[in-house]
Amino acid sequence: MKVVHQRYVAHSDAHYAGNLVDGAFGLKLFGDAGTHLAITVDGHESLFAGYSSVEFLAPVRGGDVVEAEARLASKGTRSRTVDFELRIICRSVDDTGRAEVLAEPIVATRARGTAVVPADAATPARCPSEAAPMAGRSGAGRPAR
């Protein structure tokens, strides 16, 4: 089971030389996608316990469009191991607003983390095995139509 959120990276999110966005930007998107996954799997937002690994593989810049994927790796009684991947799918070409859809996504960040649901909230999966991709700035987009 997985969920995917897509988001435009505003130029105002970049505050390092080279129009770079900090790594915490991607981790916040992982939190949103992970919460969505937990709601899909358990009907509860869950509590995030922490990351066991995080790899920053490529820079994210203002003007990019990224997608954050949260994929259920394993499910215990109350714990959920989640694999995350942040991919750049569009890239700003210059400072005039021109941009391009990338032929192949660039993997920017990978992580693995653990979420925990309260004992009274742990339930069997309630949704189909593959959730529809979601879009929206807040990560709370609507199902694709």
Residue ranges and their predicted role:
Residues M1-L47, A108-R145:
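Hot-dog-fold acyl-thioester-processing enzymes
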Residues G34-K75, S79-R80, D94, I106:
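Hydrophobic beta-strand-centered segment that forms part of the acyl-chain substrate-binding groove
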Residues R61-G62, R71-R145:
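HotDog/MaoC-like acyl-thioester-processing domains
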